[in-house]
UniProtKB/Swiss-Prot annotation:
<dbReference type="GO" id="GO:0046872">
    <property type="term" value="F:metal ion binding"/>
</dbReference>
<protein>
    <recommendedName>
        <fullName>Large ribosomal subunit protein bL31</fullName>
    </recommendedName>
</protein>
<keyword id="KW-0862">Zinc</keyword>
<keyword id="KW-0689">Ribosomal protein</keyword>
<keyword id="KW-0687">Ribonucleoprotein</keyword>
<keyword id="KW-0479">Metal-binding</keyword>
<comment type="similarity">
    <text>Belongs to the bacterial ribosomal protein bL31 family. Type A subfamily.</text>
</comment>
<comment type="subunit">
    <text>Part of the 50S ribosomal subunit.</text>
</comment>
<feature type="binding site">
    <location>
        <position position="18"/>
    </location>
    <ligand>
        <name>Zn(2+)</name>
    </ligand>
</feature>
<dbReference type="InterPro" id="IPR027491">
    <property type="entry name" value="Ribosomal_bL31_A"/>
</dbReference>
<keyword id="KW-0694">RNA-binding</keyword>
<dbReference type="Pfam" id="PF01197">
    <property type="entry name" value="Ribosomal_L31"/>
</dbReference>
<dbReference type="InterPro" id="IPR034704">
    <property type="entry name" value="Ribosomal_bL28/bL31-like_sf"/>
</dbReference>
<dbReference type="GO" id="GO:0005840">
    <property type="term" value="C:ribosome"/>
</dbReference>
<dbReference type="InterPro" id="IPR042105">
    <property type="entry name" value="Ribosomal_bL31_sf"/>
</dbReference>
<dbReference type="InterPro" id="IPR002150">
    <property type="entry name" value="Ribosomal_bL31"/>
</dbReference>
<feature type="binding site">
    <location>
        <position position="41"/>
    </location>
    <ligand>
        <name>Zn(2+)</name>
    </ligand>
</feature>
Length: 73
């Protein structure tokens, strides 16, 4: 293989919004990243029913189509 063409492989610290943090190896240029959900707080892994709303998408949907589900016209 050619020398000097491969990206640097280093440790990256990932921090979740729930407070969980872990280190993994990656070719990212950043030393740390922030996550919205991880395996400790994701509804699929915890078994708890929870809506993960990023950017108000659920509110926007309910504002546009909420009248249809409530029977109002």
């Amino acid at each position: 293989m050619k020398a000097g063409i491969h990206p640097e492989y280093k440790a990256v610290n990932a921090t979740c919004s729930c407070g969980n943090s872990f280190v993994f190896n990656s070719t990212l240029d950043k030393e740390s990243i922030h996550l919205d959900v991880c395996d400790k707080c994701h509804p699929f892994y915890t078994g708890k029913q929870r809506i993960v709303d990023t950017g108000g998408r659920v509110d926007r949907f309910n504002k546009r189509f909420g009248a249809l589900s409530s029977g109002k016209k």
